Amino acid sequence: MERYYAAIDLKSFYASVECIERGLDPMDTNLVVADSSRTEKTICLAVSPSLKAYGISGRARLFEVVEQVKRTNYGRRMRLANKEFSGESIFSSELDKDASLAISYLAAPPRMALYTKYSTDIYQIYLKYVAPEDMHVYSIDEVFIDLTGYLKTYEMTPEELVQRMVSDVLKQTGITATAGIGTNLYLAKIAMDVMAKRMQPDENGFRLASLDELSYRQELWGHTPLTDFWRIGRGTAKKLEANGMRRLGDVARRSLTQAGEDQLYQLFGINAELLIDHAWGWEPCTIADIKAYRPMNNSLSAGQVLKEPYDTEKTRVVVQEMGEMLALDLTGKELVCDQLTLTIGYDVKNLQERQLKTAYRGEVTTDAYGRKIPKHSHGSVNLDQHTASSRLIIEAVLGLFDRIINPDLLVRRITIGANHVILEKDMRPAQVDLFAETEMLKTEQERLKKEKSIQKAMLEMKNKYGKNAVLKGIHFEKGATGRERNGQIGGHKA
């Protein structure tokens, strides 16, 4: 039996929510979701469709929005006889009718808790039509659904069923979507990401496209750029292009011979298998496989991008805060770990300011924007036992920090991770050192037990009264970010 999957992506989700909360039409309102209290370099979490129409990408930085609107307004003004605007508007319908109006837009600060609530409500709407075991939540605004078992029940085609679900979401929330249907998960994703987004929307802004293996090869084997395809980043695309493969059809053709397949494995290792499958439009993984998957190794990690470059002293404060937060996260989930990792990313200013640049003699790399930066510092440290003790974790991560940090450089990014994470109840008893003092071991175990009780009490208070209900002195030191981040979800305002 042929299977049918749907991928549904809520249209400019955060921006749509902000429009709806203001009683505005998401398809007609120029709005950007960005924290303007930060610098203009802050990334926009969402841009409304009407604002995107002026050439602004969905993940632009705020200054890019400002500059593009300014450029577009200059062009509009130059076309006016008197070279002066009569007013301004945030509505595309008004701007289309009246060329004398300047383009304006709303900048809405992120409200992550609100977006999470909308996402949960929309998930409940989907559950009216399909069971949870046939749905995989890919992100806050995107889901995959196995439609196969429901087509006969509803006496509908895959397209009709998806249309009904999206119409229900629109009716109840005001948010529209883009959707793709495919005979496997990959084709559903590509139908949505590539095919649907180049189609004309209906009167509600809804786009829908379908693909099977044959139509995928006919429609998309010649498509460029390669980065439009799921899981093909700039690095992979560059490597393919350097070897004469500028389209997925080229990859499929190369894989037909043993020599070509061997070359792909030499270039990409085990990832070549997935690349070849996707070039042909194959994807064996199902939603049932995703639900059944259990990783061999578990880890927890947290990272943050600092608002400004930090020196070593202030960075150490943040690392200590992050170590404590990681320990509390483990405690709350009844987990323990026995290894920590730390990555310190340095700021671009280190190679721009003459004094810093001349002092640096280390390895240089490039960031996502092609700018030269010092190579990051990375290290790991093993703990003597599985633990969630904030004392042991902070001691270990600060020792690791002191070992790997380049004190002459300014820091911009910090990532901390806990590896070999297991459930606390699955811990093996610690190996007893025959030469250790029995009394010392007993004292340490009692100390760890007390620490665990304190950490649990802190979590209970934070859960009841808010994350800033219990704070330590470190949270008030210069450079500390913990208090502010406690009011955020995913690094953005809750």
Segment roles from a protein language model:
Residues T176-T178, T341, R413-T415:
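Residues at or immediately flanking beta-strands
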Residues K70-K83, S299, T312-G323, A327, ...:
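Contiguous hydrophobic segments
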Residues M1-I287, E439-A494:
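Gly/Gly-Pro- and Ser/Thr-rich, intrinsically disordered tail segments characteristic of DNA damage-repair
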Residues V17, G370-A494:
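Acidic, metal-coordinating catalytic segment for phosphate/diphosphate chemistry
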Residues A7, D228, K238-V411, D426, ...:
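DNA-contacting surface of Y-family translesion DNA polymerases
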Residues K11-F13, S37-K41, Y346-L351, V421-E424:
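Short, charged/polar surface micro-motifs in flexible loops or helix N-caps
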